[in-house]
Amino acid sequence: MFLIMATALTLRPVSAATETIVILVSDNEADCALANYIANLTGDVNIVVVKTHWGVYDPNITAEIISYAPDEVIIIGGPVAVPEEYVEDLQNLGISVERWWGQNRYETDLAVIKNATVRFQLQLQNRVILVAGTDLAGIEKALQLAIRERAMIVLVNQTTNITKIMERLRLRAGNFTIMGTPFTNQTMLRIREQLREHLKECNCTEIHVNMTAERALEAIQVAEKALTTAKELAENTTNPAVENILTIAEKQLEDAKDAYNSGKYGLAYGLAIAAKSKAEVVTRLAGEDIRKMIMRNTKMKLERELVRVEAQIRVMERLGVNVTVALQLMEQIKAAIRNGDYDTAQELMIKLREELRTCYLAGRGIIKGKAHMPVRRREQP
């Protein structure tokens, strides 16, 4: 499954002597916060954060990554959030890829904290920021505080076991900050009770994030974006569950807007988050259907491959890499597909992938010389 969409980038300052690492992450608020957390706490590495829509493959994202000629790509999030097509694209070009993830955003959070601490030798304080994993406003404030205090961010929900998390992260009893909004009161109350029950020495601070019109509107806009993507993908699926879930999500979003217009910002915020969650379910279900459909149709699969490789060819061509042979192979593949000669097209596609790898590795120095360079220090989120 893929759409052609714009790339959002977050840049850190760079020095000529450092390596460049791209962090590829979905626009899921939890995973995205982790990417920005790493980008702000690392020192001698140039970190480029590239965002893709949750659950959607976009060949232009691969092209954007190529334009940085990275030494390594780290993916935050599982293959549902950041599709495996990205891994295939990058590894085919000889780019090292590592995925940090878990079965859900809570497991991904723990995996990222552990891996980043080792990989970048992060010097973190004995302080933990606890925030609900679906709380947009809470996560935003938690990120700001975690960066400022060099604290760990731990995402929680109703089933979180704080004791087990501390064991996994090898945390000593220390300073805990519970970050909450009215939307997450019950979850954070349960977390607070766990801390008081299981930790005899616990310095616990609570921060309540007020629900403002601005925060409610931001949640509505995020939900609208997720729903738009879900609708586009749903047009290509016959899964009966998709339509029902979409209907519920649309109703929740409309109710969120009504609540917002009535000044009920907490209610609007909660409904918007619920609508976004359902939109992501639709994106996942539709994506699964579309992938199955493509795998069963040789022509469709080849055309999809062409879109992927053409984006890579064009960005290398723009950056001054010699892609003459690759362009010739691409035109031969198009002709073979038009003639219905799919066997020949598949054979040529293998050659084209090999040629692209050769082009990238040979032209990497050229690309690196023209790589995007940030012009100022990125502001704290």
Predicted regions and their residues:
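C-terminal amphipathic alpha-helix
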Residues: 265-298, 329-381
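Membrane-interacting alpha-helical segments
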Residues: 223-238, 299-316, 370
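Intrinsically disordered, low-complexity segments enriched in Gly and acidic/Ser/Thr residues
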Residues: 292-331, 335
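Extracellular glycan-binding segments that recognize GlcNAc-based cell-wall polysaccharides
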Residues: 14-236, 240-255, 259-292, 296
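Charged, low-complexity interaction regions
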Residues: 234-242, 260-268, 315-324, 338-346
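Sec-dependent N-terminal signal peptides of Gram-positive bacterial secreted proteins and lipoproteins
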Residues: 1-13
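Regular secondary-structure segments
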Residues: 246, 250-261, 327-338, 346
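Amphipathic alpha-helix face/heptad-repeat signature
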Residues: 219, 245, 271, 298, ...
